[in-house]
């Protein structure tokens, strides 16, 4: 599918921002050692960077991205590009500085500033898809599902990188909210375009199964204090679930972006 780069861009960047913020909160609460927090912040910034790199394949030509920058403040997509660049710069420099233990006060300020930019970025992404001509996208469910991604994927990643209890709690609560919203979301999609929605049944089913598996993984990790391998597998499973759901989402529009 032509939109596959956007699938990875949105899920990877949203999950990375969610994990980044949770790691900072966990660090402020004393839930994770500074060194481990620094490693986690740098790791999720690498994931964010990977998402951005994959996303550039959708743009096609670098000049096209530059043209988008001319509409900052007027175009949601332009806002997304600027915010992602700002988060990457602030978060990347701050996380690298903390990892290398250089200019710690400045780097701490940079990562918290990056977190603020990240929150704005998370809000800006779903605004791109509130198109009046695409009935399957223009709903509050689109915003809700995209806001849940940084909580589901980001929570699992934060748990993996040291903020175990907080990350697992956030992830499992977000998954449960996803399941609660799912009937209404499916009903809204069916009323907008039943044939197109029915064609995505396998992707939505895969997402639900993987999210359920993620809940099981969270419970196992929480109750048995499992190893990092189980935490890593849980994070992979829930992010894969979000990728499946995002593929279904982009398939709800038949015209290429």
Locate each region found by the language model:
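Membrane-interface helix-loop junctions at the exits of transmembrane helices
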Residues: 55-59, 186-187, 245, 251
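Membrane helical hairpin/interfacial module
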Residues: 19-86, 90
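Terminal, non-catalytic protein-protein interaction segments that mediate quaternary/complex assembly
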Residues: 1-17, 23, 51-52
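Composition- and surface-driven signal marking solvent-exposed, interaction-prone regions
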Residues: 231-235, 253-256
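Long, contiguous internal "core" modules enriched in hydrophobic/ aromatic residues
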Residues: 3, 10-12, 31, 38, ...
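Hydrophobic alpha-helical segments of integral membrane proteins
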Residues: 20-22, 55, 122, 218, ...
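Juxtamembrane boundary at the C-terminal end of a transmembrane helix
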Residues: 240-257
């Amino acid at each position: 599918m032509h939109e596959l780069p956007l699938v990875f861009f949105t899920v990877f960047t949203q999950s990375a921002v969610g994990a980044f913020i949770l790691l900072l909160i966990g660090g402020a609460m004393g839930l994770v050692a500074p060194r481990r927090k620094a490693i986690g912040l740098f790791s999720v910034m690498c994931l964010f960077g990977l998402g951005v790199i994959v996303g550039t394949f959708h743009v096609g030509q670098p000049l096209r991205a530059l043209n988008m920058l001319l509409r900052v403040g007027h175009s949601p997509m332009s806002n997304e590009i600027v915010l992602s660049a700002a988060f990457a710069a602030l978060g990347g420099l701050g996380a690298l500085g903390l990892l290398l233990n250089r200019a710690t006060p400045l780097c701490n300020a940079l990562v918290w500033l990056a977190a603020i930019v990240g929150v704005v970025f998370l809000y800006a992404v779903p605004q791109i898809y509130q198109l009046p001509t695409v009935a399957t996208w223009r709903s509050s469910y689109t915003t809700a599902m995209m806001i849940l991604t940084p909580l589901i994927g980001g929570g699992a990643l934060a748990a993996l990188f040291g903020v175990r209890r907080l990350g697992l709690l956030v992830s499992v609560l977000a998954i449960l909210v996803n399941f609660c919203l799912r009937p209404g979301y499916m009903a809204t999609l069916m009323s907008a375009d039943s044939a197109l929605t029915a064609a995505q049944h396998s992707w939505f089913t895969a997402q639900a199964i993987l999210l359920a598996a993620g809940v099981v993984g969270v419970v196992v990790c929480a109750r048995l204090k499992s190893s990092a391998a189980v935490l890593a597998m849980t994070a992979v499973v829930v992010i894969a679930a979000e990728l499946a759901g995002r593929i279904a989402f982009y398939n709800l529009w038949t015209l290429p972006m």
